[in-house]
């Protein structure tokens, strides 16, 4: 990766992967529009604690020389919110921004209904979701958002998996775009990419 271009870090959701639709659409858009950035989509492990350590190491190293712009989808939005706050603990002036997309607000509560065998159908990984996973997620909850102006919430009212109203309250001090209808996968994501990039930086807006 370049050491000077902005880093766009995409954090995927529960049992998802870098091969998911939004990850691929964003990567293709950045490539075809020749957006001056580096794009990274880490493949998350089943363990929240390990994911948090990996994401923090990646982002903190990048912030030594360039801005970091984070996108988090569903459970990835929960990770991303923790990550941004953790980075701001190191330096409250770090150039970091966040766009959570249909984010999970308290995923540890939802996971009570998913305890037991799980399978990631993208990579075939099978594992057991346990109370230890839930406890690790609880440790990543942050009580307050210290740079709300640097967070843009994207949510759709038709989300069939998560209650969008909880995200509206969680990110109430942040800029928000709430679309009527849609679904958990966030319909029309590709058309929303320019909105995300312009929020991150004018330098990332596609040239006409």
How should each PLM-predicted stretch be described?
Residues 82-86:
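Active-site signature of alpha/beta-hydrolase-fold catalytic machinery across serine-
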Residues 13-14, 74, 157:
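Residue-level signal for short, function-critical loop segments
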Residues 94-208:
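The alpha/beta-hydrolase serine catalytic core
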Residues 4-66, 184:
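Active-site catalytic motif of lipid deacylating hydrolases and related acyltransferases
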Residues 71-81:
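Gly/Ala-rich beta-loop-alpha elbow adjacent to hydrolase catalytic centers
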Residues 67-72, 99:
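Short beta-strand immediately N-terminal to the catalytic nucleophile in serine-hydrolase-like folds
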Residues 1-3, 207-208:
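Eukaryotic N-terminal low-complexity, Ser/Thr- and Lys/Arg-rich leader segments
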Residues 55-59, 80, 192, 196, ...:
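Generic hydrophobic alpha-helical segments
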């Amino acid at each position: 990766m370049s050491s000077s271009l902005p880093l766009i870090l995409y954090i995927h959701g529960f049992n998802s992967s870098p091969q998911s639709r939004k990850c691929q659409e964003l990567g293709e858009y950045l490539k075809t529009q020749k957006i001056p950035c580096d794009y990274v989509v880490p493949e998350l492990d089943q363990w929240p604690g390990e994911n948090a350590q990996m994401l923090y190491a990646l982002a903190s190293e990048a912030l030594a020389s360039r801005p970091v712009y984070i996108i988090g989808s569903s459970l990835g939005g929960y990770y991303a919110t923790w990550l941004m706050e953790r980075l701001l603990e190191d330096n409250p002036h770090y150039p970091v921004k966040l766009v959570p997309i249909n984010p999970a607000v308290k995923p540890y509560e939802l996971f009570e209904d998913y305890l037991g065998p799980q399978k990631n159908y993208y990579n075939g990984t099978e594992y057991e979701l346990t109370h230890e996973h839930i406890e690790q997620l609880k440790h990543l909850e942050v009580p307050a958002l210290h740079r709300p102006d640097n967070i843009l919430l994207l949510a759709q009212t038709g989300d069939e998996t998560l209650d969008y109203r909880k995200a509206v309250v969680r990110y109430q001090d942040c800029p928000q775009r709430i679309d009527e209808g849609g679904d958990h996968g966030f319909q029309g994501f590709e058309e929303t990419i320019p909105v995300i990039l312009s929020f991150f930086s004018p330098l990332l807006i596609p040239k006409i």
